[in-house]
Amino acid sequence: MSATRRLQKELGDLKNCGVKAYENVECEETNLLKWTVLLIPDKEPYNKGAFKVGITFPVDYPFKPPKVAFETKIYHPNVDEEGKFCLPIVTAENWKPATKTEQVMMALLSLINEPEPSHPIRADVAEEFQKDHKKFMKTAEEHTRKHAEKRPE
């Protein structure tokens, strides 16, 4: 299956899957290799908003993983200020061509709902998460209210 056909199928599958964890799955009108997805976490403190995620597929997809990054700011120990994060499923050494974008989105949602402070990208936020969890929750909720996208009705 060519990359174009595979991406068209995955785009259709994601748009029609009925999962409430992500919505507004879109691709650029002239570029099937660039998508945006609205990620909708269901756990505090991130359940006060939604987060736009950009996905860029390489031309040799599915043999190489997509690049995925948050376009919406998020206060999270596993996401840096530029929206980058480490998710094993999309690293070159762990990527499998059979992996689908929906699996990537579910793994990312799991990371957002269940932070991993033992593997932080932002050590200061991870330390706050572990040592002053109440302050972390308050700061993350305020940050979410200020920066996140509106949750779909």
Curated annotation (Swiss-Prot):
GO cellular component: nucleus
GO molecular function: ubiquitin conjugating enzyme activity; ubiquitin protein ligase binding
Calcium in keyword set: no
InterPro entries xrefs: Ub_conjugating_enzyme, UBQ-conjugat_E2_core, UBQ-conjugating_enzyme/RWD
Phenotypic consequence of gene deletion: RNAi-mediated knockdown very slightly reduces viability and brood size; phenotype is exacerbated on a mutant background which enhances the overall efficacy of RNAi. Increases sensitivity to paraquat and reduces lifespan at 25 degrees Celsius, but not at 20 degrees Celsius. Abolishes lifespan extension completely on an eat-2 mutant background. Substantially increases embryonic expression of sup-35.
GO biological process: animal organ morphogenesis; determination of adult lifespan; embryonic digestive tract morphogenesis; protein polyubiquitination; protein ubiquitination; ubiquitin-dependent protein catabolic process
Domain UBC core: start-end pairs: 2-149
Residues in the signal sequence: none
Active site positions: 86 (glycyl thioester intermediate)
Catalytically driven reaction(s): S-ubiquitinyl-[E1 ubiquitin-activating enzyme]-L-cysteine + [E2 ubiquitin-conjugating enzyme]-L-cysteine = [E1 ubiquitin-activating enzyme]-L-cysteine + S-ubiquitinyl-[E2 ubiquitin-conjugating enzyme]-L-cysteine
Tissue occurrence: Expressed in neurons localized in the head and tail of adults.
EC number of this enzyme: 2.3.2.23
Domain of life: Eukaryota
UniProt keyword annotation of Transferase present: yes
Subunit structure: Interacts with E3 ubiquitin-protein ligase wwp-1. Interacts with RBR-type E3 ubiquitin transferase ari-1.1.
Family membership: Belongs to the ubiquitin-conjugating enzyme family.
Function, as annotated: Ubiquitin-conjugating enzyme E2. Accepts ubiquitin from the E1 complex and catalyzes its covalent attachment to other proteins. Required for diet restriction-mediated lifespan extension, probably acting as part of a complex with ubiquitin-protein ligase wwp-1. Acts redundantly with lin-35/Rb in the regulation of pharyngeal morphogenesis during embryonic development by negatively regulating the expression of proteins such as sup-35.
Name of protein: Ubiquitin-conjugating enzyme E2 ubc-18
Organism: Caenorhabditis elegans
Gene: ubc-18
